[in-house]
């Protein structure tokens, strides 16, 4: 008797991946389920047991919150990654980590393949498959949902036929993905770019009408670009981000309504909630403004934009991403200090910043009697700075006279 091929499935506990377990078994595979917690608050024990109940031969659950925070979210923070100037890469950040864990489990289980539950029109199929092939080119990648092309009703009928539990929230019109860096939401009424998102589409943030009428002022401390404490209380990075989700979300900070250009060539309307991420990005940027020299500060946005594109496009495990990360690491050596932020009515407003590496010299900046700036030096500087345009003007006037 020939031995069954083994596949490791990225398992969420939802309908698609539960049906995928049974479908893959029918295709002749021994299915191992693998579920990660990257901060969405899943009941891992329940998910593990459900996978076994549906038919998986083994079920892994992995608490990856701190790894996600340190190795992935931190890169996004230090690079201020906002795809198309808006999207902090919530889902795009978790996909390479999930792919990494799938490969690790596959190698441990001596599996020949890995599988994911992505459809054929989203970005995630690209992110998963490119990442997996980058980490282990020998693994086969299966995409059951993309292959079976069932309608929702057909999928439910298949689940009922095989005794697969159907989630109680199946009637929700939305497609939601969440991790500690934020929450993404699409489908339903959100597919109409003119329609206002209903409050039911949000979860991490309060509507402005229900936010407090008095602000919360917090102090966020950074060490070499890493946020380490809030109001003097130190947290592991994953807990710090989740804490900021609570604090900033209570004030309605971090709602994003965005029509974005997908990697696969279509436009998609997405609603995001990223209270912690947006607060941290703003605070970190202000501390960089205080501690980076002008040339680095002016060049870094070019690297940031490219990093956002690389991550969005599924190229986390690429030489270009590694090179960009090397630049970022160098810029963070002196990004140490404290930033004071006011959270109020949908805004995270930076009100103060300080650092032992501050390049701001009050005696040079002041207009009082304590001014230490050499005003006479400005005359020679202006002459040399404007010399190229002055020479150009002289030459142009000579040409005009000749004409």
Curated annotation (Swiss-Prot):
L-aspartate binds at residues 119, 123-124. The keyword NAD does not apply. Disulfide bonds: none annotated. It comes from the Bacteria. Pathway: Amino-acid biosynthesis; L-arginine biosynthesis; L-arginine from L-ornithine and carbamoyl phosphate: step 2/3. It is found in: Cytoplasm. One of its GO terms (cellular component) is cytoplasm. Keywords: Amino-acid biosynthesis, Arginine biosynthesis, ATP-binding, Cytoplasm, Ligase, Nucleotide-binding. Its main location: cytoplasm. This is Argininosuccinate synthase. It comes from Bacillus licheniformis (strain ATCC 14580 / DSM 13 / JCM 2505 / CCUG 7422 / NBRC 12200 / NCIMB 9375 / NCTC 10341 / NRRL NRS-1264 / Gibson 46).
């Amino acid at each position: 008797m020939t031995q069954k091929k083994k596949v490791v499935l990225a398992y969420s506990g939802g309908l698609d991946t539960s049906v995928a377990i049974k479908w893959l078994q029918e295709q002749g595979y021994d299915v191992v389920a693998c579920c990660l917690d990257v901060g969405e608050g899943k009941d891992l024990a329940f998910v593990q047991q459900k996978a076994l109940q549906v038919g998986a031969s083994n079920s892994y659950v992995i608490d990856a919150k701190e790894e996600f925070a340190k190795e992935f979210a931190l890169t996004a923070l230090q690079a201020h990654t906002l795809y198309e100037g808006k999207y902090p890469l919530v889902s795009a950040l978790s996909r390479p980590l999930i792919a990494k864990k799938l490969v690790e489990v596959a190698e441990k289980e001596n599996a020949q393949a890995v599988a994911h539950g992505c459809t054929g029109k989203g970005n995630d199929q690209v992110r998963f498959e490119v990442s997996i092939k980058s980490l282990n080119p020998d693994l086969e990648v299966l995409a059951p949902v993309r292959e079976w092309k069932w309608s929702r009703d057909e999928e439910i009928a298949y689940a009922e036929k095989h005794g697969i539990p159907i989630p109680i929230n199946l009637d929700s019109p939305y497609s939601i993905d969440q991790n500690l860096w934020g929450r993404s939401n699409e489908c339903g009424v959100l597919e109409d770019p003119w329609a206002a998102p209903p409050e039911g589409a949000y979860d991490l943030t309060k509507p402005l009408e229900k936010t407090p009428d008095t602000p919360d002022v917090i102090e966020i401390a950074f060490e070499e670009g890493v946020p380490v404490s809030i109001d003097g209380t130190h947290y592991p990075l994953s807990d710090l981000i989740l804490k900021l989700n609570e604090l900033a979300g209570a004030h309605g900070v971090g709602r994003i309504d965005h029509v974005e250009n997908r990697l696969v060539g279509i436009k998609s309307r997405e609603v995001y909630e990223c209270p912690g991420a947006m607060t941290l990005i703003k605070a970190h940027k202000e501390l960089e403004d205080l501690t980076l020299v002008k040339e680095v500060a002016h060049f870094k946005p070019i690297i940031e934009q490219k990093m956002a594109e690389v991550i969005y496009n599924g190229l986390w495990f690429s030489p270009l991403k590694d090179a960009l990360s090397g630049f970022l690491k160098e810029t963070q050596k002196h990004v140490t200090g404290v930033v004071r932020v006011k959270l109020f009515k949908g805004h995270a407003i930076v009100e103060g910043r300080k650092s032992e590496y501050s390049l701001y010299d009050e005696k040079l900046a002041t207009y009082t009697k304590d001014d230490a700036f050499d005003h006479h030096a400005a005359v020679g500087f202006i002459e040399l700075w404007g010399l190229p345009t002055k020479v150009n003007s002289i030459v142009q006037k000579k040409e005009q006279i000749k004409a």
